[in-house]
Amino acid sequence: MYNQKSSMTVRYEINPPKISDDGQDVRNVLFERIETISSVCNGIHLTDSVLGIPRVSPFEIAKQIRESDKNIKLTCSLRVRDKNLNDIEKIVEQSVGTVDGILVLMGDKSDAMSSKVELIPSQVVKTLNDNGLGK
């Protein structure tokens, strides 16, 4: 048997607000949803620009959640499509102690972003692990 424990973290996925919609009212609604959700599950996963639509950073939202809730499990998606390796390493370094895990993925193409050299997600994971950031 893989896991002897009888429990696991059940996470609820939340999309941060679109950058074009971002404002205090939208964030208030988001945090009301998060508060409601956190009472019925023990983890939240924050997405990163689903369908290539620019959104507020999931890591920014995670930091705000962590300020008010020290116990909830937080994970974030991290798109590599529109970032360079230095930016990714900086995001991961700044997230230590805030998020419990990061899902590295290619991400959907964005009409708003110009095509950059595309990183390969598995290579990004290897680099993060080799640099001690995946422990």
Region spans (language model):
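Active-site beta->alpha loop and helix N-cap motifs at the rims of alpha/beta catalytic domains
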Residues: 2-135
